[in-house]
């Protein structure tokens, strides 16, 4: 395994997963940074206030800086916009991603959970800025095939964009855990997706 996919909000508290991985990176993977692909994302809730989530330039750049600090690295290989923000102009969100690459905080940018139309629009903005959109991270599995119905797979193919799906096992629904009903301690029993 050489790809470690994180987000600023992952963990039992926001940022905890990046902190834990940063410790592992320093102890178990010391000297191997150039052999690893480390990605992070921003877009979900991190702190109170008007700039604590979504896709504003202020939030994305601050989130990236905080992620780099928690990870203890100078850059991430891929930085994603974790979700489309309906209240921030797409041009602002993509300009922030472009700035993150141009400032050396990330080598590449990607999108997560954007539909086909927004993906095409975002990729065009990034292309015009000179920063290609490398990859998309949608939820995709046998029980959740929205990317096919939406046309996202075709959009990614047309754009030459790669895909790295999340929830490939449908939050555990495609594992043995649910063969005998819904376990009481499961995400499904708690009403979580």
Task: Put a short name on every predicted segment.
Residues 1-36, 40, 102:
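N-terminal binding-site loop/beta-alpha segment at the start of enzyme catalytic domains
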Residues 4, 76, 109:
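Glycine-centered flexible beta-alpha turn that most often forms the glycine-rich phosphate-binding loop
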Residues 18-32, 64-69, 151-160:
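Short amphipathic alpha-helices and their capping/turn segments at secondary-structure boundaries
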Residues 24-37, 68-72, 98-102, 123-130:
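Acidic (Asp/Glu)-rich catalytic clusters
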Residues 33-46, 137-140:
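A short, structured active-site edge motif that brings together acidic residues
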Residues 45-61, 82-88:
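Active-site mouth loops of central-metabolism enzymes
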Residues 68-88:
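Active-site groove signature of glycoside hydrolases
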Residues 84-193:
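Beta/alpha (TIM)-barrel catalytic core signal, keyed to glycine-rich beta->alpha loops juxtaposed to Asp/Glu
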């Amino acid at each position: 395994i050489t790809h470690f996919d994180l987000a600023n909000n992952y963990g039992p508290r926001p940022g905890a997963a990046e902190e834990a991985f940063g410790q592992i990176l320093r102890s178990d993977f010391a000297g191997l940074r150039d052999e690893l692909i480390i990605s992070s994302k921003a877009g979900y809730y991190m702190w109170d206030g008007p700039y604590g989530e979504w896709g504003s330039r202020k939030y994305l750049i601050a989130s990236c800086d905080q992620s780099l600090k928690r990870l203890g690295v100078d850059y991430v290989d891929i930085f994603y916009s974790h979700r489309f923000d309906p209240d921030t102009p797409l041009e602002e969100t993509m300009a922030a991603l472009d700035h993150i690459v141009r400032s050396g905080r990330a080598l590449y940018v990607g999108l997560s959970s954007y539909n086909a139309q927004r993906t095409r629009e975002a990729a065009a903005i990034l292309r015009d800025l000179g920063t290609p959109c490398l990859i998309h991270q949608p939820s995709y599995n046998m029980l959740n095939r929205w990317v096919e119905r939406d046309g996202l797979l075709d959009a990614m193919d047309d754009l030459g964009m790669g895909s790295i799906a999340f929830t490939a096992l449908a939050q555990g629904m495609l594992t043995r855990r649910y063969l005998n009903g819904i376990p009481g301690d499961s995400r499904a029993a708690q009403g979580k997706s």
